[in-house]
Amino acid sequence: MEVPNIQTCIDSGQFGLKEPWCPKNSNDKYGGVLTLKKAIAGSINTVTTFLMKQIGPSPVSSMAKSLGITSRVPVVPSIALGTLDLSVYELVGAYTAFGNKGLYTEPIVILRIEDKNGVLLEDFSPTTREVFSPEVAYTVVNLLEGVTESGTGIRLRHSGGKYRYNVVTDYPYNFTNPIAGKTGTTQNNSDGWFIGMVPNLITGIWTGCQDRSAHFGITEFGQGATTALPIWAILMKD
């Protein structure tokens, strides 16, 4: 599927909007057509808005709940761009369905409790449920692999511009193994995210302040690829 990279508006009256919603790309660049994989890799808002206009926010909100999101998910178009507040716990849990062939697995902290003699007192098993087919899960993982192959997470693969040596911690990383993931950056560069998946492991990183008035002045410094992704990379290398 290819989508034109043009600013897309959802008109007032649609999905309960009181005024038109016309989000821009973060770099304010447009033109050409993009595959979904390329658009996700580059965090292209116009394509995400196009999809939201076709699907509507209600199915997206319902899917989020099926994926273990317990925070309130407002049924509004802007959720397509990640405007709701979620915990790392919720996001990592949601990603388990992509890595487990469509099977959501609730993250748990304690697996078993033993006494001082090693006698098992309690054994805990995570709650699981099928959310979508293995084929859908595979497709999503393939799309997310594009993020580290050619998109906002490509600095996991190679060094790029030399200026980043002074900006990104412990750079470069030079990973060659399969990695699927997604960076995230909130309004005004106050929060940075990276959720990364390798076979048998999903790890989520959030950076930011409880007070959103504390933020980076420019996206180059405040984006998830600069703030959260390096922490993920250092953790994986260790």
Labelled PLM ranges:
Residues 50-51, 81, 181-182:
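Thr-Gly-centered strand-to-loop micro-motif
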Residues 10, 14-25, 56-93:
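Mid-domain, small-residue-enriched loop/turn segments at the edges of structured enzyme/sensor domains
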Residues 48, 79-82, 128, 220:
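Conserved short-loop catalytic and cofactor-binding motifs
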Residues 1-60, 104, 114-146:
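Conserved catalytic neighborhood of penicillin-recognizing serine enzymes
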Residues 18-33, 70-78, 154-171:
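Short, charge-rich amphipathic segments
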Residues 1, 77-79, 108-111:
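Extracytoplasmic/periplasmic beta-strand context in beta-sandwich domains
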Residues 53, 65, 99:
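Short polybasic/polar patches that bind polyanions
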Residues 38, 42, 87-238:
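A penicillin-recognizing enzyme superfamily signal
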